[in-house]
């Protein structure tokens, strides 16, 4: 059975940037049931960002378990998280967990947030669900970053203006190039933070654009999801 927690180059970079934290994620195989707001980004999803066949197979296996035996999925995930948290504690560190590495669900992570003894020290996610951000930003420590897709301008503007959440934007900036210092959204210039340097979005103040470089099929995307720089 595939492990439900994953380590990546991004989590390694995160742990170097923040040595007091252990970072782990869950990667499911994206589909429109997992990501109900995926119409504008599904074809350029992170599932295409250079994953090897074995990694893709593991994502599919996790997703099958989620749908076919959700109770077992939840139990196995809790066991893995508690083991990771215990390991982090022994090292004098904290565990930061992102459930939606390649999905946009809430039921499972809310289950863990509602526990008296959460199986992590900090949970965070990216989401395109505007109402979820309004209702659950800060819920029992949960941190949310709103994902911009080129069409949810008004929602992004509201969250930035009121400093409710930062907004992530995928840009055409190449991997070896610097992201712009500011980005104009709806006529307003917002400061940009480099979201590729680490993944601990909960460490950042609100009111920022989180710039992400396009990866996989998104590099050649001409749709609304990836923003030209």
What are these regions, as identified by a protein language model?
Residues 1-229:
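Class I S-adenosyl-L-methionine
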């Amino acid at each position: 059975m595939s492990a439900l927690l994953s380590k990546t180059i991004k989590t390694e970079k995160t742990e170097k940037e923040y040595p007091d934290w252990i970072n782990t994620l869950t990667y499911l195989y994206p589909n429109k049931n997992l990501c109900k707001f995926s119409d504008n980004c599904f074809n350029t999803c992170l599932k295409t960002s250079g994953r090897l066949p074995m990694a893709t197979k593991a994502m599919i296996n996790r997703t099958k378990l989620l749908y076919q035996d959700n109770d077992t999925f939840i139990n196995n995930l809790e066991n893995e998280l508690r083991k990771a948290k215990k390991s982090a504690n022994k090292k004098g560190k904290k565990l930061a967990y992102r459930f939606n590495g390649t999905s946009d669900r809430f039921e499972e992570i809310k289950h863990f947030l509602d526990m008296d003894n959460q199986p992590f020290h900090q949970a965070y996610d990216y989401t395109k669900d505007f109402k979820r951000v309004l209702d659950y930003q800060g819920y029992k420590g949960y941190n949310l970053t709103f994902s911009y897709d080129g069409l949810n301008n008004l929602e992004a503007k509201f969250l930035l203006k009121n400093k409710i959440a930062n907004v992530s934007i995928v840009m055409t900036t190449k991997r070896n190039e610097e992201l712009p210092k500011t980005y104009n959204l709806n006529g307003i210039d917002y400061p940009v933070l480099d979201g590729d340097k680490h993944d601990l979005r909960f460490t950042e103040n609100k009111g920022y654009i989180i710039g992400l470089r396009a990866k996989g099929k998104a590099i050649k995307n001409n749709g609304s999801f990836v923003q030209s720089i």
